[in-house]
Structure formats: structure tokens, C-alpha cells
């Protein structure tokens, strides 16, 4: 059902952060940093895939997502919703249901047999497609999905994620250069603010996470990760 209430961004961010912490999707590990496929080293990790197992949480997040999309993009400005393989697919399905729109999903690359399809589902050429994924770090994977959709004839100008790291300075710039505007519900600063307020983690962990958030590039380099933004 299309939402008829539109909470403010601050309320959405705080409640989203609380829910992510409550279901233990948030992990702080400064002593043994996480390594991402992009090459960054990080003391924080978030597992948005876990949300599919919590119906009350995911339903609330989908309501938030639909309200953000309608407010920022428009009520009649999207024709379809496409999920990125694989984590974006369930969220795209729930959002397309909320928005009463057709759904597709896009693979990272063509499957290599049969129709050799990279996109599953149907849309008319020129359709305005919203790309959906669970999260983004530096934004680069969204560009690959958007390019595949555009190659198939879609118009893609917006991408929605539940969670945006919100700390890599070039992420939004990179997306903008690719013709994409990103919408999200919360970022790591929202998580940190709630964690401090509610005392969810010990002070040492919170201090180390804050150091990372203030300077992720140097923190990554000092802990075995990449030290420059990928080209």
C-alpha cells in the first residue's frame, strides 16, 4: 500500500539505526578490522541481509523507504523497481509492492547460458527505473547495475539503499558523475549517535569507530586496507 504519512528524515534515521542495532545487524570490531571487496579496511560492518528474517523491522523500513522515495522522487516519476543481485532483490520486491509498481532484478553480469540475460523481468524501453540495493560503501557497484539497465533501454536516475556508509567523501560525487542520485534511510553517523545515547557498545569501541568515521581513508591505510579512492 502506498504510504500516506511522511516522517521527517531525522526520525527515520534514528529509528532505522535503533532497529539495525536491535537485530544485531551492526558489528564493531576495531581489533580485527573487516576487509571489504572494494579494498577498504573498517572497524564497522553492517549486515542488512539479516533484515529479511525480521518482518516487523523490514515492514517498517519498507514504509520508511517508500515515503522517502515518494517525497524525493515523486508519486508518478517511477515506472519500475529493479533490485541488484543478490541483496537488493528482496527489498526491491517489497518496495515495488508498497509503490504498486512492476519489479525486475539485475545481475552483476549476464548469466552465461540460455538467453544470457543480465536483467530478469519486463519493462518498456524508456521506463524510469529505480535501482534498489541493501547498502552502499563508496557507491561504485550501483554504477554497474545502472549501466546494465540503461543498456537495456531503461532510464535510471535514482538509486535507493537502506544504509549508506556516509563517510567516503567521493561516493555521492562518483554517483553524480554517473547520473545517479542516491536515497537512503541512515548512515554510520546515525548508528554512532544512537549507540552513544543508548550505551549499546563500550567506550573504547565507540571511540575507535568515531576515529574511523572522521578519517576513513587514513584509518584504512593504517589497518592494512587501501589508502586511496579506487579509480
UniProtKB/Swiss-Prot annotation:
- CDD domains documented for this protein: PRTases_typeI (cd06223)
Gene3D superfamilies this protein is in?
3.40.50.2020
Q: Which residues bind orotate?
A: 137
What biological processes does GO assign it?
A: 'de novo' UMP biosynthetic process; pyrimidine nucleobase biosynthetic process
UniProt xrefs under SUPFAM superfamilies:
PRTase-like
Q: Any idea which UniProt keywords this protein has?
A: Glycosyltransferase, Magnesium, Pyrimidine biosynthesis, Transferase
| Pathway of action | Pyrimidine metabolism; UMP biosynthesis via de novo pathway; UMP from orotate: step 1/2
Family label:
Belongs to the purine/pyrimidine phosphoribosyltransferase family. PyrE subfamily.
Protein name, entry field: Orotate phosphoribosyltransferase
Organism equals: Maridesulfovibrio salexigens (strain ATCC 14822 / DSM 2638 / NCIMB 8403 / VKM B-1763)
Query: Taxonomically, what lineage is the organism?
Result: Bacteria, Pseudomonadati, Thermodesulfobacteriota, Desulfovibrionia, Desulfovibrionales
- The gene for this chain is pyrE
Amino acid at each position: 500500500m502506498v504510504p500516506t504519512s511522511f516522517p521527517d528524515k531525522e526520525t527515520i534515521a534514528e529509528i532505522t539505526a535503533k532497529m539495525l542495532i536491535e537485530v544485531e545487524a551492526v558489528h564493531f570490531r576495531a581489533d580485527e578490522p573487516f576487509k571489504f571487496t572494494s579494498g577498504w579496511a573498517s572497524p564497522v560492518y553492517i549486515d542488512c541481509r539479516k533484515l529479511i528474517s525480521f518482518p516487523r523491522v523490514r515492514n517498517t523500513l519498507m514504509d520508511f523507504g517508500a515515503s522517502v522515495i515518494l517525497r524525493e522522487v515523486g508519486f508518478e516519476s517511477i515506472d519500475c523497481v529493479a533490485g541488484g543481485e543478490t541483496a537488493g532483490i528482496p527489498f526491491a520486491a517489497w518496495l515495488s509492492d508498497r509503490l504498486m509498481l512492476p519489479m525486475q532484478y539485475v545481475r552483476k553480469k549476464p548469466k552465461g547460458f540460455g538467453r544470457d540475460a543480465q536483467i530478469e523481468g519486463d519493462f518498456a524501453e524508456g521506463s524510469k527505473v529505480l535501482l534498489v540495493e541493501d547498502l552502499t560503501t563508496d557507491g561504485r557497484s550501483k554504477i554497474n547495475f545502472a549501466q546494465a539497465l540503461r543498456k537495456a533501454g531503461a532510464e535510471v536516475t535514482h538509486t535507493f539503499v537502506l544504509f549508506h556508509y556516509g563517510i567516503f567523501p567521493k561516493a555521492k560525487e562518483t554517483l553524480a558523475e554517473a547520473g545517479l542520485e542516491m536515497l537512503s534511510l541512515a548512515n554510520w553517523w546515525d548508528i554512532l549517535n544512537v549507540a552513544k545515547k543508548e550505551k549499546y557498545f563500550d567506550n573504547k569501541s565507540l571511540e575507535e569507530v568515531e576515529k574511523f568515521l572522521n578519517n576513513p581513508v587514513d584509518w584504512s591505510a593504517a589497518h592494512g586496507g587501501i589508502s586511496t579512492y579506487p579509480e
